Amino acid sequence: MEKQEILREFSSDPEKYYTVRLFREEGFERRACSVCGRYFWALDGRPACPEDSDDTYSFIGDPPAPRAYDYAQAWRTIEEYFVKNGHESVPRYPVVCRWRDDLYFTIASIVDFQRVMGSSVVFEFPANPLVVPQTCLRFKDLENVGVTGRHFSSFCMIGQHAVPGNGGYWKDECIDLDYGLLVRQLGIPKEEVVFVEDVWAGGGSFGPSLEYYVRGLELGNAVFTEFQGELGNHTTLDRRIIDMGAGLERFAWITTGTPTAYDCCFGPVMGRLAESLGADQDSAELAAYYTRVAVNLGRCGDLNEARRRSAQEAGISDSRMAGAIAPLGEAYMVADHIRTLIFAISDGALPSNVGGGYNLRMMLRRVAGAMERTFPGLDLDELVDLHIDYLMGTYPELDGARQDVKTILDIEASRYGDSKERMGKITAKITDRGRAPGVDELVTLYESDGITPEYLIEAGAIQEVPPEFYSRLDELHAPPPKAAGPGPELAGLADTEMLFYGEDPPEFEARVMHSSDGGVVLDRTSFYARGGGQEPDHGTIGGFRVTDVSKHGGIILHRLDGGSLAEGSTVRCIRDEKRRAGITRNHTSTHILNASARGVLGSWVWQHSAFKEEDHARLDITHHSPLSAAEVKKIEAAANGIVKEDRGVSIGYHPRGEAEQKYGFRIYQGGVVPVSTVRIVTIKGYDDEACGGTHVKSTGEVGLIRITRTKRIQDGVVRLEFVSGDAAIEHERTAAARAEGDRAAEEAKGRLQEERDAGRLKSREIIPGMLEEITGGGSAEGMEVATGPGGRRCLAAGIHDEYFHTSFGKKLVAMDPACAYCAIFEAGPTVRVLAYAGSKSGAGADEIVREVSAVLGGSGGGAAGFAQGGGKDSSKMAEAVARARVLLFGGDNT
């Protein structure tokens, strides 16, 4: 269903879709834009829509409001207005969208209240009507941030939401309120307000919308979500929704008339950055340039071309652009990106190379580069403090995350600094080749090497950032599509009664509702199905072994080993209680460890994934670095402290909205919960999580938790492998036995070393006398010595150690070059062979060793003067000695 098709249909009947009470009462006239043809409503008889009018962005330097409001002041006055008009002011939701698995970040205020149920999106509002200052993150236009004067990576969407009836309202009241906000609350002349007809469509629903502008600046868009289905065959929704989203930054901008929206929205941060540059934020030159950039970007669509045109029209030279405008643009970008990072990290996101963390790391690297280039004297922590101090009045929760934000930014900045040398070498090669990289190569350079386009611009490798670069990156790291649901073989079956959420009997009888090669469906079951990282129960059904249990919507499918059951029959079912107990302990241990890790490491720790089996489990957490031994010890100690305190573990059921309001979004550790009633597992005074798994009644039942291994499995994710209960006790027993074995081995090693040292000492004492005896024509105890025509020959077999033989042999041939020496002795599981041959002996040490080692089933090598080898067949020791005699003394092997 194309948006333009819907717009044509709706615009053909404005009375039905767009005409509201205000237009009739105030005399708004409907016109078609003389330039683009869009329909709009205005009081001043203008011929063109706001985006094509001559007064577009003329508020810069000449605001239409009698009073200026900065970011914080603008929210206070808007909140006051809506509360006075019957709305409940709701605190912002996290920017990390924990309640939707198809979004990493909150991109609009209406997302706060959307919950996915199967293939449908439902709305759950905590009040009707309400207003919310929702911080939203969007990354498709990062290259525009700091450049256009109006693009942000994070912005506050003022969400005005209502449902007709029960205190809510519909189109007439909505537009009355929005018009009243502009004209009566902010004092903007009514002739300045223009409404433009538009439509919205998404998630199978659609409806008309009215965008409202003042001097070409779109301030808000009131969407009336009214229909579902396909145009022409659509029906009216049972529950119509008012979804008005307005930009808080733009409200501040329209009332202050500053050259950019950044100047009035970042409080003291912009003042500090501008002071560092020595820049004048209120200069006529800036106002002229940014007025034109905003207009030209809308008309030509290319950022780089819009900048060139705007500089030319404002009379700004290239040198002035490079020396004044560009550095100020970097200041705007730095202020914006740091604010975004503060919100994201405060809400539990981490910069990384995967998923939503990718954009955060990209922004941080842009900030790091700009700080180094343009603001070398400024401290990042100072800017964080200035931001949080300014925002605390609107978002008090940021103050509690101040140190965590600084910690993460410091770690990431340090990593960026460490990688600069490598980045410099890669960039130099690109520069030397004389050909600028295209968009695909730029994406690869950032993906593989962390090199940002801004870094390449600074190095002279490229001239400008391609307009599509950041949107391409954003697309590459969008959330993956949902997996397909189960096949049609289970269609039409009634949901299985899940006994494991009630009395949970270990033995029960059930009726077979479906039986096939794919498995068995019962009318009721106590077998827990695989889900949430918990492995399934095993046992028997009708005497057949249960090997797997899976959940398909509300249907539980059991897989059996070696048999089938008749549909309609009643069967006896027995669950493996030992397996269930082990898995249950590990599941509660997962909750304990997750909360303990967060307490030890920092607020950014969330469960990334988990796996719970009978005798082992693992927990993957979001963390920036590998864990040290000290950190592991602290986490384990904290977890076992909770176990020893024997805290109660309780389970309660709550409407999803109430659970979120009561416990916060920390409950979504295991991911999205696609049900309207949430099962909350509470470890008293320690942890609350939405969870469908099995748990012990108190933490003392876990017994013991031992972390067996940790490793970093991907950027920003650390795995903790652990055991609990009997498995932990067995692990301790095994570890103790291993430690005892290691201790015994060390003692044996020490004794062996002592023996070696004693042997060496003895060798030092006896070698001189033995050498004197042999070189004097005598013999030595335990050695065979003979003198022939070629010189003296010595054979030592089965005596002394390697130290003795190497020392003795080397000295012997040095004293008597006509001598040859061979030693054969046991060393552990092998038999060693050493040979020395003096320069005048006529013997070859290598030949002796090679042949003797072969007898032992081994090999050897070396030179004529010295060689060594051996073999493992100690039973051939006598044969080896006999072969050595032949080689040394002649004769045969007898």
UniProtKB/Swiss-Prot annotation:
Q: Which GO terms describe its biological process?
A: alanyl-tRNA aminoacylation
Q: Where is this region: Disordered?
A: 739-758
Gene3D superfamilies assigned: 2.40.30.130, 3.10.310.40, 3.30.54.20, Bira Bifunctional Protein, Domain 2, Threonyl-trna Synthetase, Chain A, domain 2
Q: Where does the protein principally reside?
A: cytoplasm
SUPFAM superfamilies in the record: Class II aaRS and biotin synthetases, Putative anticodon-binding domain of alanyl-tRNA synthetase (AlaRS), ThrRS/AlaRS common domain, Translation proteins
* Listed cofactors: Zn(2+)
Residues binding Zn(2+): H587, H591, C691, H695
Q: Which Pfam families match?
A: tRNA-synt_2c, tRNA_SAD
Q: Does the keyword 4Fe-4S apply?
A: no
* GO annotations of cellular component type: cytoplasm
The entry's keywords = Aminoacyl-tRNA synthetase, ATP-binding, Cytoplasm, Ligase, Metal-binding, Nucleotide-binding, Protein biosynthesis, RNA-binding, tRNA-binding, Zinc
Q: What class of enzyme is it?
A: ligase
Per its record, the protein catalyses: tRNA(Ala) + L-alanine + ATP = L-alanyl-tRNA(Ala) + AMP + diphosphate
- Subcellular location, record wording: Cytoplasm
Give the note describing cofactor binding and stoichiometry: Binds 1 zinc ion per subunit.
InterPro entries reported in the protein's UniProt record: aa-tRNA-synth_II/BPL/LPL (IPR045864), Ala-tRNA-lgiase_IIc (IPR002318), Ala-tRNA-ligase_IIc_anticod-bd (IPR018162), Ala-tRNA-synth_IIc_core (IPR018165), Ala-tRNA-synth_IIc_N (IPR018164), Ala-tRNA_lgiase_arc (IPR022429), Ala-tRNA_ligase (IPR050058), Thr/Ala-tRNA-synth_IIc_edit (IPR018163)
Q: What does this protein do?
A: Catalyzes the attachment of alanine to tRNA(Ala) in a two-step reaction: alanine is first activated by ATP to form Ala-AMP and then transferred to the acceptor end of tRNA(Ala). Also edits incorrectly charged Ser-tRNA(Ala) and Gly-tRNA(Ala) via its editing domain.
Belongs to which family?
Belongs to the class-II aminoacyl-tRNA synthetase family.
Protein name (database record): Alanine--tRNA ligase
Provenance organism: Cenarchaeum symbiosum (strain A)
What taxonomic classification does the UniProt entry list for its organism?
A: Archaea, Nitrososphaerota, Candidatus Cenarchaeales, Candidatus Cenarchaeaceae, Candidatus Cenarchaeum
Gene designation per UniProt = alaS
